[in-house]
C-alpha cells in the first residue's frame, strides 16, 4: 500500500535541510493549497484512487509534551549540529531556532505512525529519512528501508530545482514551456 503523507503539521515548521536561514512559518491555508497541487502532480505518476492519503497533523497534533520529550531523547544536539546547514549558520553567526531541530523528529515520527517499511526522498532528505529509522527502532518497530534519489539541477544550472528559487520546470506546465526551459 502506497501512503502519501501531507505534512500539514511539519509544513508549519518548515524543513531546514539545505537552508541558510529559517523558513517562514506557513498557514494551514497555504499548506492545504500546496497539498492540493501536490496531489494533482502525484496524479501524473500514480493512480491517486489506489493510494492512501493521510495528514500528519492527525497524529503529530495529538502528541503530548511527554511524547515529544521521548521523541527528542532519541537524538543529541551534537547530532543535529553536525548537519552542514547548521554548521554554516553557526560560522556565520546566523540564528538556528529550536523548532528547526524538531523537523526531522516529527518527520521521523511519521514513519512510526504509519509503520512505514520503505520511505522515498531526495538526497537532501537523507538525515530526516534515517531519523525515521532510528525513531522506529526506539519505538520497537522494524526500521524502514530508505531510498534516496538525486536532486534535479535547476534551470539556472547552479542550485537544486525549486519553486522558491524560480529555477524549476513544473510537472503541470505546457510541454512547449517545459522544453523551452531545458
Name each model feature, range by range.
Residues 1, 9-20:
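Active-site-adjacent loops and short helices of periplasmic peptidoglycan-processing enzymes
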Residues 3-10, 34-50, 54-182:
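Alpha-helical recognition segments enriched in aromatics with Gly/Pro capping
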Residues 16-32:
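A charged helix-plus-loop insertion that forms the helical arch/lid used to bind
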Amino acid at each position: 500500500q502506497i501512503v502519501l503523507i501531507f505534512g500539514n503539521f511539519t509544513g508549519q515548521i518548515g524543513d531546514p535541510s539545505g537552508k541558510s536561514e529559517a523558513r517562514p512559518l506557513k498557514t494551514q491555508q497555504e499548506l492545504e493549497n500546496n497539498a492540493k497541487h501536490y496531489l494533482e502532480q502525484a496524479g501524473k505518476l500514480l493512480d491517486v484512487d489506489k493510494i492512501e492519503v493521510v495528514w500528519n497533523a492527525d497524529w503529530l497534533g495529538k502528541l503530548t509534551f511527554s511524547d515529544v520529550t521521548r521523541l527528542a531523547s532519541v537524538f543529541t544536539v551534537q547530532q543535529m549540529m553536525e548537519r552542514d546547514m547548521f554548521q554554516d549558520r553557526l560560522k556565520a553567526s546566523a540564528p538556528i531556532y529550536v523548532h528547526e531541530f524538531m523537523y526531522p523528529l516529527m518527520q521521523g515520527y511519521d514513519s512510526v505512525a504509519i509503520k512505514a517499511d520503505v520511505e522515498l526522498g531526495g538526497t537532501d532528505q537523507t538525515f530526516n529519512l534515517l531519523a525515521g529509522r532510528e525513531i522506529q527502532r526506539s519505538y520497537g518497530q522494524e526500521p524502514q528501508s530508505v531510498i534516496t534519489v538525486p536532486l534535479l539541477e535547476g534551470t539556472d544550472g547552479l542550485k537544486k530545482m525549486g519553486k522558491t528559487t524560480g529555477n524549476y520546470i513544473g510537472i503541470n506546465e505546457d510541454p512547449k514551456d517545459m522544453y523551452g526551459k531545458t
